[in-house]
């Protein structure tokens, strides 16, 4: 592809951007639909602390397509942009930049100072975001952005929380939750599910000696650091356990019977003592592994408890319980009154109780703990295991599960409402509804919403010393209770506010909300609901449409659903498109460090935004599957789709200007069949696009219009070219111009939501003064039923299928299309052959064949062969396949033709018969010498490849035409330039030229020909003959 072509597309897009901006087109589209039905759209807010990447551009493109389409379809579509400002992503950037990485560093720096630093960097990359949003062609309203750190937004978040609290859906409790030691704060379950990795961890089996006899319980774990906090062992009361004696050590071990072979594969290595039930082990006491919490024995620690969740598929059938560090452990121990100890601080280091490992990071302590157990003969096995483990989504550090005091939303109480809400949501792709999202809802657990962090919306709870709570609903309420003017709701403005009421002093609890709570409250908080714009907010709820990546099924989609179902018993959105992840070309995650992907700016500067948009939209990534990004793929879209479309427009413009065609001259024209076909295809495309957009299926909407560009450029224009070239004005030429104008104009509107730059550029070159100012101010086209001709579309599809077969045969057997052939035979259904016989000349012209014959039976030049389809028949007939193969080989051509006509046959196998259908039999064709054959689903095509002298001479003439016109193109001659040529060639080429001189001159606008003795100009190979050609422009 010429570099000039690539450069022209980005340059055109920059001109379109300038036009949109100078003419305020986006604002005009809003004004144009003011008063029309509103299409409600919620935009998932990004953080501006990082640069936008392909994932953002993908989601932004999807949103833009749907919103542009809804606008053109007659809706008012407000598109407010929002910014996520709170939470770990911002805090983490400030911590790194200021070196506040040690425990207590932020408190020493000062919460006020830290929060103001957070406020400063929130919009670090806002200009870059605006650039990329504009450059990708996305229209959003940056003049009315909302921010999660705005006072109005935060007040609405308080209202949401207060409403949940009033319904009894908020409580304080201690639970084991995912915990980031790097951040020093708990995370929600859905955050913990966002970043799993395959890692190698320790795998150890510890020995727990019973107190009342010499038996030793074996328990397996992949977290040796939790053994320090062991408070109980659990067994399944319904399982069978065994007691054996290890012959080498003499020790007696107790473990699950089903796990015995896993740990003792050598039957001779132990002595069998006996079986015992899990129930009989319950209540037995054992010796603690470590001395740190021996005093807990009097409170119920270090005994065996029952647990039904234990399985023997892994481990030993005995489970070590550290109730502070495992959710199942926590509930089981709580049920059986086992105490809880938590000797790990928020940074993941052992506290002073663990004297031998105090201050050591728990994961680093694994080896030391295992070594100590080994030295004290308390370690049965030590190894490693590869498994999936959760990592912090922001810091990429391992998470732990830790018992913390937190505030929770009672999600499990409203789970039934969430599941009901999901039933009314239209998901694209559909499998996510009851798959990834539905299953996540079914397993939803209470949401830990409090974070012991700094930069976030403070939880509006004030508590007195005796535990009474004041849950504040609004700024006005806080001002009335505190007597202070409130100008900001962040921690450093309100933490010191003390409320005095009924003789008590109330102090705020030291937590902020999980920033996902902010995001989930966005439908209300963006409008300061219910304090302002209540009617508007309620009218636009739920959203008609949202879109984000697959990870948001456990993020924003989820939190939106939790809050909307809890507050209003409704979904937060009606329709959602879920996209997959854009990976680097090597299949790995895109990484700046690895430099394994091209920058989005480079791609758009090289190929243009529309090429990138279309590449993404026409890929599996819009169906929630992963895409390996390839700049070659973007280039292919430009070369194979956008450039041909641009050439089609240039073709129309060139000849319309040359012959002075006006779009107003389009009445009372008699259209050719090919005109009626392309118009029928056009309005069928309108219908398909509308149907697919109604289902929010962007991939299905894009694919047909890409196919249509092929129909338009490689069939309609190519087949109609001579009609446009006619020098004399005629009704047929006017019909061709009128048809092509209508197609290009309507098509510019069809593609406008998807590739808005290309559409605008086309439209501006086609529009007349009375047309709307921009394609994006037009209505989306409607189906014109009287122009849709299904039978004609089917016939043309058959013709193109036959032509494709013919081209494949020529390519396979190295027969240039410029070389004419005498005969072609088409075999197919009788009723289709009759219709196609009327267009034999069209097929003949396209394939350069003199005579096209249509047959309902295979001609004598071809033998039809049938063989069993082993995949289809294998399971059904088993070892009788050879018999069937032999019987099929013995069929006559008449019998095979009968099978092809009927679609089934009854085959005799000795005294038995078997019925076979088309799926059971593979059909192929064997052509006689001089003939070649190929089949499609509907037809068999046979070419007569025998070349006579007249055919050879015509082939040379056509080859000469090709070489001359190639020279015209390379020399950038105008389409009307007349030329003189000088030709040096062998006798056969000269004879061919003389024989076809009129044809050659007409096709190349040649007015003078000279045969010369010496080589001159460019040298060419003309069907194996060396030829030199030179040309000169001699007129117009």
UniProtKB/Swiss-Prot annotation:
Signal peptide: none annotated. A motif ('HIGH' region) lies at residues 46-56. A motif ('KMSKS' region) lies at residues 589-593. It holds the Pfam family DUF5915. One of its GO terms (biological process) is isoleucyl-tRNA aminoacylation. InterPro entries: aa-tRNA-synth_I_CS, aa-tRNA-synth_Ia, Anticodon_Ile_ABEc, Ile-tRNA-ligase, Ile-tRNA-ligase_type2, M/V/L/I-tRNA-synth_anticd-bd, Rossmann-like_a/b/a_fold, tRNAsynth_Ia_anticodon-bd. Its cofactor is Zn(2+). It catalyses: tRNA(Ile) + L-isoleucine + ATP = L-isoleucyl-tRNA(Ile) + AMP + diphosphate. One of its GO terms (cellular component) is cytoplasm. Keywords: Aminoacyl-tRNA synthetase, ATP-binding, Cytoplasm, Ligase, Metal-binding, Nucleotide-binding, Protein biosynthesis, Zinc. It is found in: Cytoplasm. Monomer. Catalyzes the attachment of isoleucine to tRNA(Ile). As IleRS can inadvertently accommodate and process structurally similar amino acids such as valine, to avoid such errors it has two additional distinct tRNA(Ile)-dependent editing activities. One activity is designated as 'pretransfer' editing and involves the hydrolysis of activated Val-AMP. The other activity is designated 'posttransfer' editing and involves deacylation of mischarged Val-tRNA(Ile). This is Isoleucine--tRNA ligase. It comes from Chlamydia muridarum (strain MoPn / Nigg).
């Amino acid at each position: 592809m010429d570099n000039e072509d690539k450069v022209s597309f980005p340059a055109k897009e920059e001109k379109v951007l300038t036009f949109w901006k100078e003419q305020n087109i986006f604002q005009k589209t809003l004004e144009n639909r003011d008063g029309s039905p509103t299409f409600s759209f919620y935009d998932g807010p990004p953080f501006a602390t990082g640069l936008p990447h392909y994932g953002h551009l993908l989601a932004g493109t999807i949103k833009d397509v749907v919103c542009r389409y809804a606008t053109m379809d007659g809706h008012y579509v407000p598109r407010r942009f929002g910014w996520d400002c709170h939470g770990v992503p911002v805090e983490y950037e400030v911590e790194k930049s200021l070196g506040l990485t040690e425990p207590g560093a932020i408190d020493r720096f000062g919460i006020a100072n830290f929060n103001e630093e957070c406020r400063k960097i929130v919009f670090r990359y806002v200009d870059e975001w605006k650039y990329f949003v504009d450059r990708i062609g996305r229209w959003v309203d940056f003049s009315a952005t909302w921010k999660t750190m705005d006072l109005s937004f935060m007040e609405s978040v308080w209202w949401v929380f207060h409403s949940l609290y009033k319904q009894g859906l908020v409580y304080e409790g201690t639970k084991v939750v995912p915990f980031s030691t790097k951040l020093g704060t708990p995370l929600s379950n859905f955050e913990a599910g966002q970043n799993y990795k395959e890692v190698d961890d320790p795998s150890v089996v510890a020995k727990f000696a019973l107190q009342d006899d010499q038996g030793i319980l074996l328990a397996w774990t992949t977290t040796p650091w939790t053994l320090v906090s062991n408070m109980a062992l659990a067994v399944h009361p319904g399982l069978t356990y065994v007691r054996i004696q290890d012959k080498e050590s003499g020790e007696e071990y107790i473990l699950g019977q089903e796990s015995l072979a896993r740990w003792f594969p050598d039957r001779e290595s132990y002595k069998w003592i006996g079986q015992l039930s899990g129930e009989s082990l319950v209540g037995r006491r054992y010796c603690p592994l470590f001395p740190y919490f021996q005093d807990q024995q009097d409170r119920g620690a270090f005994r065996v408890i029952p647990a039904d969740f234990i399985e023997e598929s892994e481990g030993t059938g005995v489970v070590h319980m550290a109730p502070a560090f495992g959710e199942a452990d926590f509930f089981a121990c709580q049920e059986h009154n086992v105490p809880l100890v938590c000797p790990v601080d928020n940074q993941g280091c052992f506290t002073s109780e663990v004297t031998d490992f105090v201050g050591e990071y728990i994961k680093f302590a694994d080896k030391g703990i295992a070594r100590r157990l080994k030295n004290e003969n308390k370690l049965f096995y030590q190894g490693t295991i590869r498994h999936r483990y959760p990592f912090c989504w922001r810091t990429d550090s391992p998470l732990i599960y830790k018992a913390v005091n937190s505030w929770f939303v009672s999600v499990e109480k409203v789970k039934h409402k969430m599941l009901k809400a999901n039933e009314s949501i239209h998901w694209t792709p559909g499998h996510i509804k009851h798959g990834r999202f539905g299953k996540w809802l079914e397993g939803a657990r209470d949401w830990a919403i409090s974070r012991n962090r700094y930069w976030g919306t403070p939880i509006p709870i004030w508590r007195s010393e005796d535990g009474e709570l004041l849950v504040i609903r609004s700024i006005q309420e806080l001002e009335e209770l505190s007597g202070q003017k409130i100008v900001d709701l962040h921690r450093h403005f309100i933490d010191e506010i003390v409320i005095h009421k009924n003789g008590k002093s109330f102090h705020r609890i030291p937590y902020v909300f999980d920033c996902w709570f902010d995001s989930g409250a966005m439908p209300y908080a963006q409008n300061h609901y219910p304090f302002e714009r209540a009617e508007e907010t309620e009218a636009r709820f739920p959203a008609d449409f949202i879109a984000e990546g697959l990870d948001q099924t456990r993020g924003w989609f989820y939190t939106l659903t939790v809050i909307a179902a809890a507050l209003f018993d409704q979904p937060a959105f009606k329709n959602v498109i879920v996209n997959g992840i854009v990976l680097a070309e090597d299949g790995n995650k895109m990484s700046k460090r690895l430099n394994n992907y091209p920058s989005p700016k480079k791609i758009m500067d090289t190929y243009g935004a529309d090429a990138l948009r279309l590449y993404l939209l026409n890929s599996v990534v819009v169906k929630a599957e992963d895409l390996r990004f390839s700049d070659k793929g973007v280039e292919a879209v430009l070369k194979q789709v956008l450039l041909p479309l641009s050439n089609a427009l240039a073709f129309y413009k060139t000849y319309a200007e040359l012959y002075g065609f006006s779009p107003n001259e389009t009445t009372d024209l008699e259209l050719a069949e090919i005109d009626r076909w392309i118009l029928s295809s056009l309005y069928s495309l309108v219908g398909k696009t509308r149907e697919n957009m109604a289902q929010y299926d962007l991939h299905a909407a894009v694919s047909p219009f890409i196919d249509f560009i092929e129909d338009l450029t490689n069939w309609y224009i190519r087949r109609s070219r001579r009609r446009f070239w006619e020098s004399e004005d005629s009704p047929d030429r006017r019909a061709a111009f009128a048809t092509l104008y209508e197609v290009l104009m309507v098509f510019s509107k069809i593609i406008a939501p998807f590739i808005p730059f290309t559409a605008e550029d086309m439209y501006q070159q086609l529009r007349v003064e009375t047309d709307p100012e921009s394609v994006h101010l037009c209505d989306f086209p409607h189906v014109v039923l009287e122009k849709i001709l299904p039978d004609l579309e089917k016939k043309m599809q058959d013709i193109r299928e036959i032509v494709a077969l013919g081209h494949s045969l020529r390519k396979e057997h190295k027969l240039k299309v410029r070389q004419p052939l005498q005969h072609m035979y088409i075999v197919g259904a009788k009723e289709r052959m009759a219709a196609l016989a009327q267009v034999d000349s069209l097929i003949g012209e396209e394939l350069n064949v003199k005579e096209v014959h249509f047959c309902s039976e295979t001609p004598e030049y071809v033998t039809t062969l049938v063989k069993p389809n082993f995949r289809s028949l294998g399971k059904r007939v088993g070892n009788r396949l050879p018999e069937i193969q032999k019987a099929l080989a013995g069929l006559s051509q008449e019998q095979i033709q009968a099978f092809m006509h009927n679609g089934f046959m009854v085959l005799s196998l000795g005294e038995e018969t078997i019925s076979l259908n088309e799926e059971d039999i593979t059909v192929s064709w064997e052509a006689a010498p001089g003939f070649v054959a190929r089949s499609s689903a509907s037809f068999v095509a046979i070419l007569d490849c025998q070349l006579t002298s007249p055919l050879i001479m015509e082939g040379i003439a056509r080859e000469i035409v090709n070489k001359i016109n190639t020279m015209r193109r390379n020399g950038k001659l105008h389409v009307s330039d007349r030329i003189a040529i000088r030709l040096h060639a062998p006798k056969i080429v000269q004879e061919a030229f003389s024989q076809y001189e009129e044809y050659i001159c007409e096709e190349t606008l040649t007015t003078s020909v000279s045969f010369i003795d010496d080589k001159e100009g460019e040298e060419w190979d003309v069907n194996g003959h060396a030829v030199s050609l030179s040309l000169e422009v001699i007129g117009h």
